[in-house]
Curated annotation (Swiss-Prot):
Keywords: Cytoplasm, NADP, Oxidoreductase, Pantothenate biosynthesis. This is 2-dehydropantoate 2-reductase. It comes from Streptococcus pyogenes serotype M6 (strain ATCC BAA-946 / MGAS10394). It holds the Pfam family ApbA. It catalyses: (R)-pantoate + NADP(+) = 2-dehydropantoate + NADPH + H(+).
Amino acid sequence: MLVYIAGSGAMGCRFGYQISKTNNDVILLDNWEDHINAIKENGLVVTGDVEETVKLPIMKPTEATQEADLIILFTKAMQLPQMLQDIKGIIGKETKVLCLLNGLGHEDVIRQYIPEHNILMGVTVWTAGLEGPGRAHLQGVGALNLQSMDPNNQDAGHQVADLLNKANLNATYDENVVPNIWRKACVNGTMNSTCALLDCTIGELFASEDGLKMVKEIIHEFVIVGQAEGVELNEEEITQYVMDTSVRAAHHYPSMHQDLVQNHRLTEIDFINGAVNTKGEKLGINTPYCRMITELVHAKEAVLNIQ
């Protein structure tokens, strides 16, 4: 199969690297010039659990011409519409497009560009880091769940899960992936934005009495909005999942902290807490915590003059 990685940041590099170890062709797509040049000149340098340099083709999305068998979307949420526009030429009748982006509502965007028949939605707990252009740090283990959006095309989902398992990516075909997507979004909604605003680690947030109270209110808002949309969510179970995750990740600054505080980049807040607030408004459900957090993050972006 010919597999394109659409958005070759840290996670894209992880998936591209691991899939390249199977009998499948991988092409990385990205728009970051320094990253593209580094990989073209020196290969992708992998550190962490393995130390290796691999030669992988990389190009801008608009430069890709060969029809894809599989495209895995790892672009930033706000760049998704442009990416989908740029890759339209490599999507054939049977091309599978797997979305593994963090956050909520991406399927609505994808449907504007790609038929339901071709769309797979998923969620992953793999992690990865970039140490600079062309350098990926891959440590630890993870897994992912995915599902075909077209109930009459579940074979496509099983084929993709098999391919990813050959790459040791621990994929499971999930008959109902949406609750897992919401659960992961809730983890991000409780930790990412709050730690970015408070300039703290996940452990520091959860050690604070007021921080913990805020976390539980955010979880409640995610659950009531998700349930109103028909998603099967259990507040007690999700609260426990968030708490367990906070213990494992206690010493980490989450990705939004890296974006906002460390690197002064725009965040994906509109697709996490902001998405819950927007959905809540449409459903007539008040979500004051998600609304305030979204406004605070946007205010911080403005204060830092992030464009």
